[in-house]
Regions:
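Short amphipathic alpha-helix used as the core "switch/output" element in two-component signaling
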Residues: 42, 65-78
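Active-site residues of response regulator receiver
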Residues: 56, 86
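Helix N-cap/capping motif at the beta->alpha junctions
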Residues: 33-42, 64
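C-terminal output helix
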Residues: 110-119
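Receiver (REC) domain active-site loop signature in two-component systems and cognate sites
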Residues: 59
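Charged docking surfaces used in two-component/phosphorelay signaling
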Residues: 18-26
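Alpha4 helix (beta4-alpha4-beta5 surface) of REC/receiver domains from two-component response regulators
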Residues: 66, 89-104, 117
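Active-site beta3 strand of CheY-like receiver
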Residues: 48-54
């Protein structure tokens, strides 16, 4: 492991989770995943070893924007950094993610070197 901390991947698309998990584990990161924001928030409350969240922004029921707001308003969770991962790459989308409380932003398809730089910076 790069460290003793865990990355939580929250994405409703199992293919995205699988791909990120494979790439990050190959780089010696420890990963866990959730297929919805609600499940991810519950995992964050139960697993104190999660160091950072990779959050898909477009999910049904609770989207990434709302999930980040919930995290940032929770005393236990507000210090955990979040990297927004989204297919939305138009002008203003990055700013919208950061305004919601994300600490970083990566557009899909994910540039792994960019993601690793952010992880190293934020963990």
């Amino acid at each position: 492991m790069k460290n003793d901390k865990t990355i939580l991947i929250i994405d409703d698309d199992s293919k995205n989770i699988f791909a990120l998990n494979a790439v990050l584990k190959a780089r010696k990161y420890d990963c866990v995943s959730a297929n919805s924001a609600a499940v991810g928030l519950e995992m964050l409350k139960q697993n104190k070893n999660i160091a950072i969240v990779l959050m898909d922004m477009m999910m049904p029921e609770m989207d990434g924007y709302e999930a980040i707001r919930v995290m940032k308003n929770d005393e236990e969770l507000k210090e955990i950094p979040v990297i927004a991962i989204t297919a939305q790459a138009m002008t203003g989308d990055r700013e919208k993610c950061l305004e919601a409380g994300a600490d970083g932003y990566v557009s899909k398809p994910v540039d792994i070197s960019e993601l690793v730089k952010l992880l190293d910076l934020l963990i």
